[in-house]
Amino acid sequence: IYNQVPHWSKHFPMPAKLHYRETENPEFIYFPACVTRIFGGSSLGKDDLITVVLRIADKAGIKISVPRSVHGQCCSQIWEHKGDPKGQQITANATVEEFYKLSQNGRIPIFCDTTSCTHTLLTLARHKGLLTPDNLTKLNLLKILDITQWLHDHVMPKVTVKHKKKHVLLHPTCAARLMNVDTVMTEIAHMCADNVTVPPDSYCCGAAGDRGFMFPEVARSATRD
């Protein structure tokens, strides 16, 4: 039981307020990942990620929609991590079906705000037998973007950064490296800061899904430098 119950920390933010935005003829569908919905803004009083993304989209004049039903979807990664193939199969198929419907048969691009979840969605087809033949076809018609790509390609060309940070320290995640969007993250950071540092030895943070909650010593060891 000990290894199945996450360690609690007073630094964990409370759940985010669920935001909905039904937009007529949206340019993008915004999918807030489970981790975004579970953890809200920091204890320092900063806004949660969903609020920030909606505000950025408004500043860029980009019409995005956050339908109510997206809050019930999951990329299925957690089920894979827990060794539950049936749960993974049910969740993955349900999400693909809902995304296909929300995107109007794949016409409207969908972006996800958590890179590891984006990577999971984009690689569902690699799991033989995970998706039904019908949903595999639907998946191939979906246009799924990571938030880094959405920011770089669609937001940054439409906004002007007036107050740059002096220095930003960047930690590209494992999924960002797998998707080759770590360079995209760095380019965005350079647009927002005078100096950007990416530590040469910044590799896995030790989180590994929720494993860092179960074994915090792994995360401490991975980030000790």
Name each model feature, range by range:
Residues 1-225:
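Iron-sulfur cluster-binding electron-transfer modules in prokaryotic oxidoreductases
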